[in-house]
Amino acid sequence: MNGSSRTTRGAVFGSAGLLVGVALLSGCGSGDEGGSKDSDKAGSSDSAQAQSPAEAVQATNEKTTQAETAKIAMTVTTSGGQAQGKKVTGDGVMDLQDGTSKLTLDQGPNTIEQRVVDQVLYQKLPKKAAEQLPDGKTWMKVDLGELQTRGGGNKGLNDPAGSLAYTKSLSEKNVEKLGTEKVGGTKTTHYRVRLDLAKMAKGDAAQQKKLREQLGDEVPMELWIDDKGMTRRQEIELQVQPSGAEGGKKQKVKTVVELSDFGTEVDVQPPPSGKTADMTDQAAKGAKQSS
């Protein structure tokens, strides 16, 4: 592979941790509806306190989705190997039901504009990275649905239509209440959650095997849920297998996502097609090499 292809692929996966975070909190409405909206909206602080830890976590998927949109702030920290101390921050807006989003990502001196529309990721790269795109294009895109179909994405982790829906099946042994804390000035209850990879694979033996090889038996996640049952902060830490020079050395990717200003306006359009280069093939090849 030539230098240009390697550089562009690096741009695709440089924000892989961000994609994980976005996916976990987007498209929350997929799956069973479960209950009426009126009864959920009537839920009070008292009813939230009466729930067991597992019940609170199971319910936050639907309650958060009912807000429809929110502002989002993210921090992704990568450690291990050459990525030691690498940090990316992002902020923007998101549609919590279908995953449409617009974020500005900052990594040191570099800034990337990122959009997700109809399960397609678009990134406007920094000038130096954009020079590697063909025909003078300034945006790259990756079809996330196609990426998953081709084995370049993890169901339940990288599916923008999946998100927190798998928390509905958690049992009491998988959830621990850690206490109360404030997130952005809002009182929340802090939970530690262990996600079962067998349930995330949804009966797909091959997918389950792949997830176990990449992530182990369980995925640890922490949630901060407010008195209305809505997720205010989510933290997930993954051990991932990078592609390229790092070889067999796994890297730790910690993603923290905070939601605020529920109901904010979200109006996101894809960039002009004439300025966009499709990098789905390169992304799929890179993902398979890292699996």
Could you describe each region identified by the protein language model?
Residues 2-10, 29-291:
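Subset-of-secretome marker
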Residues 8-20:
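Sec-dependent N-terminal signal peptides
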Residues 19-22, 253:
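A generic, residue-level signal for flexible/boundary positions that often mark functional hotspots
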Residues 24-27:
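C-terminal motif of bacterial Sec signal peptides marking the signal peptidase cleavage site
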